[in-house]
Amino acid sequence: MNLRDISGNAFPELKELLLSEIGAIEIGGITADSRKAAPGSLFVAVAGTKADGAAYVKDAVAKGAVAVVSGHAVEADVPVLVVTDPRLYLSLAASRFYGKQPDTMVAVTGTAGKTSVASFVRQIWAFAGHAAAQIGTTGVIAPGREDYGALTTPDPVTLHALLAELASEGVTHAAMEASSHGLDQRRLDGVHLSAAGFTNLGRDHMDYHPTIEDYMAAKMRLFDTLMEKGAPAVIFADDPWSDKAIGAAREAGLEVRTVGRNGQYLTLKRVEHFRHKQMIEVHHDGVIFEVDIPLAGDFQVANALVAAGLAMSTGVPAATALKALEKLVGAAGRLELVGQTKNGALAYVDYAHKPDALENVLTSVRPFTSGRIITVFGCGGDRDKGKRPIMGEVATRLSDIVIVTDDNPRSEDAATIRSEVMAAAAGALEIGDRAEAIRHAVSMLSHGDTLIVAGKGHEEGQIVGSVTLPFSDHEQVRSALAELEGSKI
């Protein structure tokens, strides 16, 4: 493929240059990482938070890059294309270069619930007979493959290479998570979406976004920029930010489909909570559906409704989509039951690492907890510091016993992070060693108690400094339970 074809016509400033012999340069690959440049490749110099890719142009050219794209003029021994938005160029160019995508794709954004919704949509599609995949925080799951561990929204080159690979493998449907970072950094531009969803908005990524309004605006790029007019936007209607999402979708010319108690497309009329499931009554188009969802928590009902709405918006009949909800399997590390003691105390692992998510999890287990809620959690380093005391307050308000421990301290001092959480966690215990904190919590479990180990969920490593050490909350909980005679794992 030549440079003219890869560039397309989205950048008028390149028109004359691409009509010259420069446009005929053959491109054999595309990258924004100078270390991955190879003979015949196109290097796109993207400015990051810590470094500007333009500083590595010479390195990329030395490795064989035959052209460079930059946001400003740079010296190079190869043609340089200057564009207003290198990130956007990278995404659109990657989309053209790799070409193929699954025929039906949806993306979901929101502070919490993205992974579960993407997982549920995949499961509903599969139930309906489609070859379906999900892409997001827990990795890539598709027929015949489970690749765990990835960014919520992969970089554009990785993403489009993956989409082409999935399409070649026969995947026809794919559900993606759309993070605010990914949307703001143009990583999803060039993805052909059939429908999009919004779950909720709460405090997160305040180290990246200057205000909550900026955070919401980044989320809404999914509606106002990436979707074609008339496409369905499935919005959970019961969140404080739902009206703003509805307004953004309508202003973008999308077909709004709301779900939840205040929803018009899927109206939740009744919920009955049981220990490991919930019975819901949902109305759609004059028909009443009673559905047993095999998952606990109001937040899972919300996630299931958004997922059903997305599946229905991509051609799955309502009866099929809602029937599929009865077969759902929770996403890895999302209120996942790991085991129980011989006296019936339950031990869960959950990814909740934001105030709203932690509150949702703890309020969800209260109805079936006759004893105490014991919570083990910490906060990550090099991330939004403002949420640390908020999470400490949430944990102590909604738990009977709280143990504050280490999460992924990264480059920060772990003790300092814990102290910032403890400042608002009156009466909490502090045990820095996460494995020891989990063992101590398990040893305290009595009849009717519920243990929540929050923050890391599906992760299989703990980031200390620049090193990722092997660590799994699941394994630590199982190990601690194994030390208790008669526990079920």
Curated annotation (Swiss-Prot):
Residues that, per the record, bind UDP-N-acetyl-alpha-D-muramoyl-L-alanyl-D-glutamate: 34, 152-153, 179, 185, 187
Pfam family, one: Mur_ligase_C
Protein's UniProt keywords contain ATP-binding: yes
Record InterPro entries: Mur-like_cat_sf, Mur_ligase_C, Mur_ligase_C_dom_sf, Mur_ligase_cen, Mur_ligase_N, MurE/MurF_N, UDP-N-AcMur-Glu-dNH2Pim_ligase
Positions of short motif Meso-diaminopimelate recognition motif: 407-410
PANTHER family: MUR LIGASE FAMILY MEMBER, UDP-N-ACETYLMURAMOYL-L-ALANYL-D-GLUTAMATE--2,6-DIAMINOPIMELATE LIGASE MURE HOMOLOG, CHLOROPLASTIC
Protein name per UniProt: UDP-N-acetylmuramoyl-L-alanyl-D-glutamate--2,6-diaminopimelate ligase
Lineage: Bacteria, Pseudomonadati, Pseudomonadota, Alphaproteobacteria, Hyphomicrobiales
Gene, per the UniProt record: murE
